[in-house]
Amino acid sequence: MNYKDTLLMPKTDFPMRGGLPNKEPQIQEMWDNDDQYRKALEKNKNNPSFILHDGPPYANGNLHMGHALNKIIKDFIVRYKTMQGFYAPYVPGWDTHGLPIEQALTKKGVDRKKMSVAEFREKCKEFALKQIDIQKKDFKRLGVRGDFNNPYITLTPEYEAAQIRLFGEMADKGLIYKGKKPVYWSPSSESSLAEAEIEYHDKRSASIYVAFDVKDSKGKVDSDAQFIIWTTTPWTIPSNVAITVHPELKYGQYNVDGHKYIVAQALSEEVAEALGWDKDSIQLEKEFTGKELEFVEAQHPFLDRVSLVINGEHVTTDAGTGCVHTAPGHGEDDYIVGQKYDLPVISPLNDKGVFTEEGGPFEGMFYDKANKAVTDLLKEKDALLKLDFITHSYPHDWRTKKPVIFRATPQWFASINKVKQDILDAIEDTNFKVDWGKTRIYNMIRDRGEWVISRQRVWGVPLPVFYAENGDIIMTKETVNHVADLFEKYGSNIWFEKEAKELLPEGFSHPGSPNGEFTKETDIMDVWFDSGSSHRGVLETRPELSFPADLYFEGSDQYRGWFNSSITTAVATRGQAPYKFLLSHGFVMDGEGKKMSKSLGNVIVPDQVVKQKGADIARLWVSSTDYLSDVRISDEILKKTSDVYRKIRNTLRFMLGNINDFNPETDSIAETNLLEVDRYLLNRLREFTASTINNYENFDYLNIYQEVQNFINVELSNFYLDYGKDILYIEKKDSHKRRSMQTVLYQILIDMTKLLAPILVHTAEEVWSHTPHVKEESVHLSDMPKVVDVDEELLEKWNTFMNLRDDVNRALEQARNEKVIGKSLEAKVVIGNNETFNTAEFLQQFNDLQQLFIVSQVEVKDKVKLKILIR
């Protein structure tokens, strides 16, 4: 008989190679056919719920690794909560309105001028739905489980209706109003922008110092003096109506070679240096506070207009002259201070950023091109003291990447100031994983101005506002709710298909329309109002969901985006935040921490990873990141991730192979009868389980990734599985020693598969399908292992032994390196005491020392110092 035939060798059909790109789709098809999402909900339907509300990605373009990071972590969370017994529905969503889809259609050759607005909007809808289908397929391929057959989409009639009703509630509370204010305006997209749609990039701008002659000194300054202002936007000089000084700052009238200039004393040296004044020729003639300068009149440099000197608290001595060029039509601070003095709001630009007839000599010029014309005219009028150029951080349109301007236009606003304190209080009641997350959104709300919610586009949800013949605004509870009902029945396109009168309640009348004629608002809502209404359109309308959600989790850019708009609308209408817990992740960079770009050739996309390596590799990579900050990915990083995966897979395969003849119902050994080494591993498993559960609870996936490797490498591969090979292969099939080890191996396999299931969703399912005698049809329909108390005394004893074993292994490794031995089984180890620990006495507690150390012989000597000899 062949000796090998007498061994109980491992047997399993579980393949060594994962073959994930081919195998995963088969597993996913099985899940779909079994309707596993519904089964998971049904299993926990009577249990407490956990609601993670999905922030809707934009329905345009292919998925990038940021999408993958976001959706995979959400899947970790929801799957874990489900396995912990929570009723945890996951409804994915999509954001579908806005400029990018309009631009995408234009690039495809759609000529919107050749069709009605309603027809163009239909094409936008078709495009968005196609994009959703593509992204949906890609999200599912990543192993993400959710109600993909019934997602929420911001363009659906029921969602739009909920959004309109929320708008109406805010209007009823006086939180919606129309006003002419300077707002971020994007000439490149011809629309206003919210703060969330602004990003900052470096821009080269003109830097000019301009002299304004005193026209009426009010007896406070010399009549031949000049105020000096500094600005980086020369094109706004035609809109200047005032010069703002701080009431409490000290100002000086300085004589410089016969010229008299007024600047803040704290900035006089900087101004002198900038303008090249000879310090010896500068003489301070008069001093005054900003308050004393109030109502002095200056003359506009080239227009027949007074520039009034006014007081403003926003003036600082950080830069400039302390005398601030003030154009209420082109600046928020300018507008606010201008209102106090009833100053005119001049904004002579059209939607494209081109000067109108009101711009006089600059008519027809693009604002940026007008900078030179303005400086030339200032020079001609001897008002330009200095022209230079600087590079500074400047607001840009986040979509077009082009500079934006402040421009006063009639817009619709949601009042932030009226509810700001309530929002800040709601933030205090919200839980955060990291303190800086709370600080970030708190400061953004605290410093936020009014929210401009109107957009001058067509692809979006219309503002449900009408106008009477005399211009009166009609925005009543009755009219808004009627529009909501129409949208719910027909969709928002009806707004563009019907006349205003047909959109109003039957028989509606208004004193401002004696002839019964009405017009409708042409602006649409900011897309952040769309997604920011999801707590109403989804959480409060879907029967399986509830308000507030337990968790919102998105990229860190959403502190100023979705997190921000959502809490604003929720507090305004419900008096509380829409989330109990707020969590965010960083951005995905390349292996060197650089932003990915096609030009650098460092772009990695989810589709590429899935096709080459498999979704489980992408998921394992996600678990290996410190996602709270920016994370890195590269081919090298993915290669290392694949190596870790192989180690995990091979360990699971080894355990599968060695429990093939084990039936837990009939072959298990009671814990009290297990060999001590097996009880030790069982307790280490319990420690590992408790730690892993705690890490899942705290969203600490990197800890799980590291501790899984540690448990597999240190406890299993380097010790227990190596130690147990002789027992598993050579001992009699039903021997107590073998069954004792199999009892623990089976428990390790079951628990580890469950603990890995939220991360390695496909591999865990594959392992489960090859594990004999499991009760649940899927690991994802099983429960997480329970956290139980450990035997601390036993662990302490064996931890001491394992430290000693590490010493032995180091000595064995040294002997191998010195060619004294080949394999450890060729070695005899002699162990003695050290000065503080009686090793010999301690080791008398252990049986099978040579097997535990995996050597041929162990000799324990008393009354000698610790020494490990290889013989």
Swiss-Prot record:
Keywords: Aminoacyl-tRNA synthetase, ATP-binding, Cytoplasm, Ligase, Nucleotide-binding, Protein biosynthesis
UniProt catalytic activity: tRNA(Ile) + L-isoleucine + ATP = L-isoleucyl-tRNA(Ile) + AMP + diphosphate
Molecular functions per Gene Ontology: aminoacyl-tRNA deacylase activity; ATP binding; isoleucine-tRNA ligase activity; tRNA binding
Principal subcellular localization: cytoplasm
Top EC category: ligase
Localization (cell): Cytoplasm
'KMSKS' region (motif): residue ranges: 595-599
Residues where ATP binds: K598
Recorded GO CC terms: cytosol
Record's keyword annotation contains Nucleotide-binding: yes
Biological-process GO terms, alphabetical: isoleucyl-tRNA aminoacylation
NCBIfam families associated with the record: ileS
Family: Belongs to the class-I aminoacyl-tRNA synthetase family. IleS type 1 subfamily.
Protein name: Isoleucine--tRNA ligase
Organism: Staphylococcus epidermidis
Gene name for this UniProt entry: ileS
